C-alpha cells in the first residue's frame, strides 16, 4: 500500500488533536476468509465480517442472473424462498414475457433447485460467488462497524467520506490502515496539530 504524503511536515514532539482520515476501497473484491484474516492479522475484531446469509447473497446473484429476464419472489417460509423467472423478449415494438421456471432457494444450506438444469447451475454458481466474496460496499460497512465499536469517528461533511479521529485512537487508525493495505484499499491520514500560542508548531 502506498502511503500518501501529508499536506505539511509535522515536527517530532508536536502534540496532535487527532487526524482527518478518508479511505477508499473502490473496486475491491475480497474473499470472506481473506477479509477475516486481514482483520485478525491487524489485531482487529473479526466479528464485524459476518457470514452472508444465503437469502441476501441470492439478492446479489439475481443482479447478474436478471439479464433479459425478470426475477420475482413469490413465496417464503422459514426454510426456503421461491422465485419466478420470467424471460423477456422484444418483438417489433413490444415486449413479450414467457414463464421460464420457479426456482427454490434453501435458506439454510444455500442450495438452489429448479426444473431447468442449466439455469440451476448458473444460479448456484452466482450464489456461491456472492456468498464467498465481499465487495467495496461490504468493506466500507466493516470499517464503519469497527469505528462504531472501538473508536470515535466525527464526520467532516454531512454525506460522510471524510472524518476526524481524536489522537487517542491513532493506534487504531494504524490497525485499520494495515487491514486495508492487505485487501487492496487505501487510507489517507492528515495530522491535526493542537497548536501553540505561536502557531501550529508544524
Name every feature range the model reports, one short phrase each.
Residues 2-106:
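Charge-rich interaction surfaces and accessory domains that mediate macromolecular binding and assembly
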Residues 2-11, 21, 30-49, 57-62, ...:
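Terminal interaction module
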Residues 95-173:
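Internal, hydrophobic cores of structured domains that mediate oligomerization or house catalytic pockets
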Amino acid at each position: 500500500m502506498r502511503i500518501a504524503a501529508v499536506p505539511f511536515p509535522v515536527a517530532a514532539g508536536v502534540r496532535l488533536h487527532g487526524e482527518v482520515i478518508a479511505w477508499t476501497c473502490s473496486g475491491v473484491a475480497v474473499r470472506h476468509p481473506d477479509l477475516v484474516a486481514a482483520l485478525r492479522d491487524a489485531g482487529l475484531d473479526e466479528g464485524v465480517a459476518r457470514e452472508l446469509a444465503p437469502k441476501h447473497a441470492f439478492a446479489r446473484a439475481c443482479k447478474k442472473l436478471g439479464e433479459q429476464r425478470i426475477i420475482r419472489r413469490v413465496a417464503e417460509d422459514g426454510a426456503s424462498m421461491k422465485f419466478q423467472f420470467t424471460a423477456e423478449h422484444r418483438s417489433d415494438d413490444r415486449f413479450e414475457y414467457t414463464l421460464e421456471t420457479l426456482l427454490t432457494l434453501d435458506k439454510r444450506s444455500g442450495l438452489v433447485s429448479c426444473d431447468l438444469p442449466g439455469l440451476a447451475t448458473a444460479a448456484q454458481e452466482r450464489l456461491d460467488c456472492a456468498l464467498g466474496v465481499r465487495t467495496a460496499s461490504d468493506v466500507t460497512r466493516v470499517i464503519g462497524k469497527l469505528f462504531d465499536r472501538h473508536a470515535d469517528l466525527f464526520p467532516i461533511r454531512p454525506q460522510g467520506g471524510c472524518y476526524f479521529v481524536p489522537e487517542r485512537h491513532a493506534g487504531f487508525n494504524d490497525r485499520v490502515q494495515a487491514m486495508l493495505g492487505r485487501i487492496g484499499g487505501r487510507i489517507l491520514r492528515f495530522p491535526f496539530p493542537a497548536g501553540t500560542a505561536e502557531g501550529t508548531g508544524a
